[in-house]
Regions:
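Phosphate/pyrophosphate-binding catalytic cores of soluble transferases and nucleic-acid-acting enzymes
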Residues: 1-266
């Protein structure tokens, strides 16, 4: 999955030590809770060497898990997850929406009001539904039950760009991934297309192409469109993150570094 997940180049990896790059296989079950535990353990180790570490991302949910903590959720039977995936493949996102509305109407209304884009996010919706079905309890009943303390103080920097510029860069990035061999990469993964790790943008659209549900051109356009939607959701998420200083992506790096240096001296 090197191309589809945009693994850093050898030059980038050589510039500084990296962690959690290609450290899991598609066959492993891995949750945001697992990431929280592993990331905090790694940070404890790294802070013994240097009291400044850099986390770059990425998924807002995973970033929040490290910075703020993540509620405990019980393990879900893989059979339940497989059944939900199968029904989603047949019935689409509306199945997940209806299930969440039935099983946890309180949380459905909260998401609908505060972050409606999430209702169109298959991965998040599958998680909500599997927790409800697997535990017999509403997803919302597991949220906010724990208080978390961190032994570090984060400095949060956000980069933003004009929407037209951002969308053009996304389109160019997809074209580059195609030229670098994304289609061939997805083809090798096709026998495992049912796995949860492959239900992501860039893979599921090309699986539809290999299933002869769409043309290649349409699949590529869908990747671009879904990536743009994902970027929009992420910006909405990060804009809600407290104490974030935002810079235009074209800002001179010196200005950003100066800002960070001032905060480090406090």
């Amino acid at each position: 999955m090197k191309i589809g997940t945009a693994v850093p180049s050898e030059e980038e990896l050589a510039a500084a030590p990296h962690h959690f790059i290609q450290n899991k296989t598609i066959f492993e079950s891995y949750s945001v809770g697992d990431f929280e535990q592993e990331a905090l353990a790694k940070l404890d180790e790294l802070f013994q060497q240097n009291n400044i570490q850099i986390m770059v991302g990425g998924s807002g949910l995973y970033v929040d898990a490290v910075l703020k903590g993540f509620d405990d959720f019980p393990e879900i039977d893989v059979k339940i997850r497989t059944e939900i995936n199968s029904k989603y493949d047949t019935l689409g996102i509306s199945y997940l929406q209806e299930q969440l509305q039935t099983l946890d109407s309180e949380y459905f209304k909260k998401v609908q009001t505060e972050n409606p884009q999430t209702l169109q996010n298959p991965q998040r919706m599958k998680r909500f539904v599997e927790v409800c079905i697997g535990t017999g309890k509403p997803y919302s009943s597991f949220i906010g039950k724990r208080k978390f303390a961190r032994n570090f103080t984060p400095i949060v920097i956000g980069l933003e760009a004009d929407r037209e510029i951002l969308y053009n860069r996304i389109n160019q990035r997809v074209d580059l991934m195609i030229s670098e061999g994304l289609i061939e990469e997805v083809k090798t993964l096709y026998p495992n297309k049912h796995l949860n790790a492959l239900q992501t943008v860039g893979y599921r659209e090309l699986f539809d192409y290999f299933d002869e549900k769409t043309t290649l051109d349409f699949a590529i356009e869908q990747i671009k469109m879904n990536t743009r939607r994902f970027a929009k959701r992420q910006m909405t998420w990060f804009k809600r993150t407290e104490n974030t200083t935002w810079f235009d992506y074209a800002t001179d790096r010196t200005e950003i570094f100066t800002h960070i240096a001032k905060l480090l001296k406090k």
